[in-house]
Amino acid sequence: MSSQAPADKFSDAVPAEVVQIIGRTGITGEVTQVRVRVLEGRDKGRILTRNVRGPVRVGDIVMLRETEREARKIATR
């Protein structure tokens, strides 16, 4: 059992707005690759490529635990 309360898990998360949907990835397409603009924190204004699970559309706000990593680009075969 985790010692953290559910609200504590996202207390250090940073909000980011989805600005573009790039495509689907994952073996069965369960992950969406999106470009997001960081809204707060030291990387405010930076645009990142991230993978998101679940339904997402342009304008949605996603909470990022960290803003250092970017997702790899989707390779076309």
Curated annotation (Swiss-Prot):
UniProt keyword Repeat, yes or no: no
Keyword Zinc part of the UniProt annotation: no
Biological process terms in GO annotation: maturation of SSU-rRNA; ribosomal small subunit assembly; translation
Superkingdom of this protein's organism: Archaea
GO CC list: cytosolic small ribosomal subunit
Keywords recorded for this protein, A-Z: Ribonucleoprotein, Ribosomal protein
InterPro entries: NA-bd_OB-fold (IPR012340), Ribosomal_eS28 (IPR000289), Ribosomal_eS28_CS (IPR028626)
Single GO MF annotation: structural constituent of ribosome
Similarity comment: Belongs to the eukaryotic ribosomal protein eS28 family.
Protein's recorded name: Small ribosomal subunit protein eS28
Organism listed in the record: Thermofilum pendens (strain DSM 2475 / Hrk 5)
Lineage: Archaea, Thermoproteota, Thermoprotei, Thermofilales, Thermofilaceae
